[in-house]
Swiss-Prot record:
It comes from Trichomonas vaginalis. Coiled coil: none annotated. Residues 572-625 are cytoplasmic. Residues 443-526 have a biased composition (Low complexity). It comes from the Eukaryota. May bind host tissue. Keywords: Cell membrane, Glycoprotein, Leucine-rich repeat, Membrane, Repeat, Transmembrane, Transmembrane helix. LRR repeats lie at residues 38-60, 61-83, 85-106, 107-129, 153-175, 176-198, 200-221, 222-245, 247-267, 271-293, 325-347, 348-368, 369-392. The chain crosses the membrane at residues 549-571. Its main location: membrane. This is Putative surface protein bspA-like. Glycans are attached at residues 15, 227.
Amino acid sequence: MMTPGKSSKTPIVGNLTTLGITIPDTVTSIGFKTFYGCSSFTSIIIPNSVTSIGTKAFTGCSSLTSITIGNSVTSFGQEAFSECSSITSITIPNSVTTIRDFAFSGCSKLTSITIPNSVTSLGSHAFRGCSGLTSIIIPDSVTLIRGSIFYGCSSLTSITIPNSVTSIYSSAFYGCSSLTSITIPDSVLDFGSAAFQECSKLTNIKIGNNVDSIGSLAFKRCSSLTNITIPDSVTTIANSAFYECSKLTSITIGKSVTRIEGNAFSKCYSLTSITIKTTNDITSSITTDVFLNCPITELIYETTGLTFLTYEYFKDKVTLIKFNIPKSDSNSMIRLQEITSLPTLTHFTNLNKVTIENINELTIPESFIEGDNFEILITNNIKSIDPNAFKDCSINKFTYLGTDKLENDFLKNAKSCEEVITSTKYSDNEIGGMTITHKQSEENPNQPGENPNQPGENPNQPGENPNQPGENPSQPGENPSQPGENPNQPGENPSQPGENPNQPGENPNQPGENPNQPGENPSQPGENTDDPSKSKENKAIKGGEIAGIIIGSLIGICLVVAICFGVYYYFMRIKPKNKNDDNEGNQEDTIANGTNEVTNENVLATFDEQPNNESDSNGLDSAEV
């Protein structure tokens, strides 16, 4: 048996230079430091007669590349193969039950290792510094992953933790900088401090539903982690648990959390959103450094444990608060018996948006919010809103997608309210004392809806007929009947009798004649020519244009007839009469008794000559017409 003396502290075969060594079958154990520091030999065969390998038996055998371990070995001592920096692979026989601390630590070129189901115990630091190890499967027989077992395994990309594991100790995966994802099974009850610290490529981690605490530094500097959900089983998030997770954008705090310790999320420079499910008052345990240097802008409440709203750190950072309290949450329903309304949010100095998805029987209280340029979205029915809920608030947009009617003048009493949107199923045209400007479907709360009160959007709605009051383009500045503005009558005076465009049958406000009809003048309200929904209106416009052409043609024909009639009248009646007057000569006026007497012939002549004194023959023609 190759064992040192009781007092010996030196290796039995120290500084062995032989390239290969075979241990004889008579050997049953390899003792303490037997081949310690044998840096030259490259291979070793351990026979089936050997049952145990002692502490540091092969430590520092830096050229050793091949090891054959017999099937009778049951345990490896501490540091048995530590610092064997040239070993690339090891197969552990099914006879082994225990691998002790540091057994393979520092084997930097080890890329694969097979651990059989016979192994029930893996010691701490067992594979520490195995920087070439890329993957490992932990057998179902292992119940504990001890401290620093894979510390510094920087090439490890995947690992499977079996359902048999109940605890993960401190620094178990510290510095596994290539590990991208890991699933902690429900069998795990806790994991210690720094368990996943410096896992810089870890982007996804699922924490089991039975973990009761997250240790300090557990995920410190996991700089690729983007989101984390703390399961409902967790009660404590220890100090610096997620310290400097620089890409973490959102977290969900589970229902049972009662304590969050200092710097838990400090220096998470991208953390903007927190979802709170806990019903416990955790503000007393939170110090100001818990979220230090976190640009949090959004709080989402899925619980009635609303005391978290009083946390001072949030007051000048949060811009959006959302409430979504599930009706099926029994804990929430118990809490609902204790409170009747949401708390006021007036201490949030930069808050500008509130979304309420579900608050069950809670109401919105007086002085709920204050500030300017608010957007409020309520996606479901709520019990009531206090008439003075928004009295110190100017609202850009208020959206209510519930169907139950809301009483009180809560919008009218606000400092201002620019836009009011409801569901298409909301029966009234007013809400909160304000007229509804748009209605939209519940499925798409962010899209602008239709304004039931705006003219010009539905061609069948009242108020869209261009002849309706308020839309007559004959208003000052818009009358196409002004001289030179009617494209169908260039150079004509529409003020003459028979040509007034406001007379029946010639009204330019009829469909098709008004150049300001919807679809022709994009500056008119409600006449967006790019809207495909107005195809019916466009068809009406085309029909109107055809009618306008016909009417214009008729007017032109009438003008031609009038001119012809005037020419006829002149040549057939007026010109012959003038010739007769020349033959008769000038007659003397007869004056009797101080009175001018006019002969019948002069009266007739005077009547006949009158048209020649008119300055505008067209005027006479029009009168005759």
